[in-house]
């Protein structure tokens, strides 16, 4: 019988000291993909522009690209685009109004099954 593997468990406080780009989902670290492909960046840019245009007259809500969202003590995510109504200090620490993930072959499995 083989040995049981125990996955490491981390908190956002530990995550803050790491090098590189990581998401932390229920205490489990996930390395983030390298810089997105141009097609992906254009999609994100187009969505940002459209949402920004629609929210132009709203004084409380803003559109953000890829900011850190601390969901709880052991989960920090970086969605591709968010609509947030309220002030953000260092990172988002409350639920956004809208979260957008642009799926790619490299990230679809994690984004669909682990992240949201």
Model-derived regions: residue spans:
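Gly/Pro/Ser/Thr-rich low-complexity, intrinsically disordered segments predominantly at protein N-termini
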Residues: 1-116
């Amino acid at each position: 019988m083989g040995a049981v593997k125990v996955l490491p468990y981390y908190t956002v406080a530990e995550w803050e000291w790491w090098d590189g780009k990581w998401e932390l989902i229920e205490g489990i670290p996930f390395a983030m993909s390298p810089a997105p492909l141009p097609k992906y960046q254009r999609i994100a840019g187009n969505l940002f522009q459209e949402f920004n245009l629609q929210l132009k007259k709203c004084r409380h809500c803003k559109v953000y690209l890829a900011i850190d969202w601390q969901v709880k003590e052991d989960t920090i995510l970086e969605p591709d685009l968010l609509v947030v109504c309220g002030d953000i200090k260092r990172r988002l620490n409350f639920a956004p109004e809208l979260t957008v993930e642009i799926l790619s072959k490299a990230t679809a499995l994690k984004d669909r099954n682990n992240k949201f």
